[in-house]
Amino acid sequence: MDEVRGLVREAAEWLRTSKDTDQWADPWPDRTGQRERILNDLLKGKTWIVWDGTTPAATITVDTDEPLDLNDQPVWPARKRHEPALYVRRVVVSRRYAGKGLGAALLDWAANVAKRDHGATLIRVDVWTTNTDLHTYYKGQRFIRRKGRDPRDLTNYPSQALFEREVTQPGSDYKKLFVEEGDRGERKSS
């Protein structure tokens, strides 16, 4: 868990100093809540860590359960809930590995998992509302912005920019970047 939290802290610092955004400036919903969410996702096998030797290079969380706000209300609008989708969260690449296509490879890997393991036709992500650079990144990864719920209906939920992508052929050759290890399915970058 410390590796994931370390990657998130590193990303938060970079976002604050280099991108002038408040994304992850404070743990959401608070330190304890963030810690519990990360731990639960790890224990349930939803969070994956990409390792380069003993160094954590990136992390991604994939989940068939839709994200919820603080009142346990779904983030995605009702009209979209019937579509089979895999939800992607907490995609973080260490700055040391930035610009090498690792984020794109993780998203392509998630699309493959969505189709292969869950029969899903979409991968979805809810992106920090005010981080327009990140919105542009996801658009560059073949995601389309979708209309969400009325922001007044969501309780203190900072990621209200909703994006989805059809599960198609990957844009990257993620299989060359990852080598599966052990029966936990951890991935190492090569």
Task: Please place each PLM-identified region on the residue numbering.
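Conserved beta-hairpin
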Residues: 44-63
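Hydrophobic pocket/interface hotspot
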Residues: 4, 38
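Conserved beta-strand segments that form the floor/walls of ligand-binding pockets within enzyme
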Residues: 49, 61, 87, 92, ...
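Conserved GNAT-fold acetyl-CoA-binding loop/helix
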Residues: 9-37
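C-terminal "cap" of GNAT-fold acetyltransferases
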Residues: 80, 125-131, 139-141, 147-190
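Conserved acyl-donor/pantetheine-binding loop and adjacent beta-alpha core of acyl/acetyltransferases
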Residues: 61-98, 153-155
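Conserved GNAT acetyl-CoA-binding A-motif
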Residues: 107, 114-126
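Conserved acetyl-CoA-binding loop-helix of GNAT-fold acetyltransferases
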Residues: 93, 99-112, 136, 140
